[in-house]
Amino acid sequence: MDKTTANRKTLTIHEVLWSNIAMPLTGRTPIAFPLTVIWTLVYLSFLALGGVDSVGWLNNGLVVPAVAMPLTVLLFLEWGALALSRKAAILVALCGLLFWGITAYFIHSTGDWRFWQTLNTVALLGTTFTAGSWLAEEILEPVHLIPVCIVAAAVDILSVMFGPSAKLGEHVIFYLENATRNFASGLPLDPPPALNLLLLHWPRPGTTVMAPLLGVGDLVFIAFFLGACRRFELPLFRATFLLLLGLGISLLLAQFFHKPMPVLPFICGLFLLGNLPALRTRSS
């Protein structure tokens, strides 16, 4: 055992999550591509279970986010280890938008729309990842994250109550009500309208209904916060925990009130509360 290994401190879970120790990404092997394959296979597996009756506890709506949201955050976390230059990020984002548009077209022009929605979801994740990571690189000082979080949370609240997100929520609720009725009656499910493709959906086992989870802005900010952790050497695992906690709270409230809830106030608020001392220290 060398001197470096002997002097290395063993961190407890509490210290990893709540100390201001930065968790560098250097010297590690990113598993971004294998994780993308795993994410897609799990998605397809849930999709295959859509036609299976009596799958028991899998019918519970909470199983979907319990699997999908941690996988999505981990996907952003791993791809965030591969920092892109500004030109590369713009190129990847444009390619992602093009691929998203192509798959959206085939969703509404072919009978096998579920296959194309799988690819559309991957394109949505790729585009939002590069957008969020690029925006994180444009932040000059860690303390600038504070007003960004405050403004983003306020805008999200107004959007969900009165703005575009409110309109999108109406479309989603209308589509889900029709889809649920069609499923109960044994009728085929129509493809989702174009606006619904701006949401991350996940197949719900035991039904043919796709469960909406997160919007474009939510996905961008997940990538943004993880990119900011990499850029300013903020505690990465703590940020991941806080993001998942915020997503979980917003989802539970949406389930309880049976209406769309703003996500950014929870993930932005928890991110600030957990990292405020570190943001001030690294900006001084």
Where are the model-predicted features located?
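A membrane-topology feature that recognizes alpha-helical transmembrane segments
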Residues: 12-284
